[in-house]
Amino acid sequence: MLLVIDVGNTNITLGVFDEDKIVGTYRITTTIPRTSDEFGLLFCDLLHVKGIERTSIDSVIIASVVPAIMYSLTSAIIKYLGITPLIVGAGTKTGIKVLTANAKEVGADRIVDLVAAYEEYGGPVFVIDFGTATTYDLVTEDGKFTAGITSPGIRISANALWNDTAKLPEIEILKPDSILAKDTVSSMQAGLVYGNIGATEYIIKKVKEESKLGSLKVVATGGLGKIIADATDMIDIYDPNLTLKGLRYIYQKNR
């Protein structure tokens, strides 16, 4: 079985594949620092909960945007699973040609998402990942990554509201029934959710106009992506496991 690990700024997401089938997914907080033993024991416990023996894992691939965590994480995989993981980085075969101004600055998570979207749904495709930051990336019909957009994620905006104001409370991020809010909590929810829906729809519209790709498919992923995807008909597909699928595709290209 293949263990795939996506290290994000907020969460670490793990998936286990048996051939092309996901048999387990897990999400833990990206806590720094953690020792290799903490990671190792945590991973073994998570696998055990789903009835997956650690000895059944024969391959591991990691994509990370948090360099500080990689030594402990890699050491844990080697020590507890007996496997040297494949780490997505420069020189990794992806099948996507990066044509942005500085390819080395593109986060591994973005490339992984693009690989999955292109392999699963074909191009041209516009991928939106509602993570810590919200990223929007464009891949052409022939697999070229030509443009990307980055904005503050929904949770970053929410944290700014309750951390940088004296009286606004911490709230659950949900779409209220109406944008015409009548209390503090629903007014914050309306601003966060409807504001992001509006921004997303405008960006999609402008990208379609400027790229002149009328047949562009729009694919969304990320923890809060379903809230936005369910509220607009401009997103064609919501795939919560897009990044995990991308890691599997990349592993297959590099085995």
Curated annotation (Swiss-Prot):
Active site: 109
GO biological process, one term: coenzyme A biosynthetic process
Residues binding substrate, per UniProt: 107-110, 184
Cellular component, GO annotation: cytoplasm
Reaction catalyzed: (R)-pantothenate + ATP = (R)-4'-phosphopantothenate + ADP + H(+)
Co-factor remark: A monovalent cation. Ammonium or potassium.
NCBIfam families: baf (TIGR00671), PRK13318.1-6 (NF009848), PRK13321.1 (NF009855)
Summary of subunit composition and partner proteins: Homodimer.
Free-text function comment from the UniProt entry: Catalyzes the phosphorylation of pantothenate (Pan), the first step in CoA biosynthesis.
Name of the protein in question: Type III pantothenate kinase
Organism, scientific name: Lachnoclostridium phytofermentans (strain ATCC 700394 / DSM 18823 / ISDg)
Gene that encodes the chain: coaX
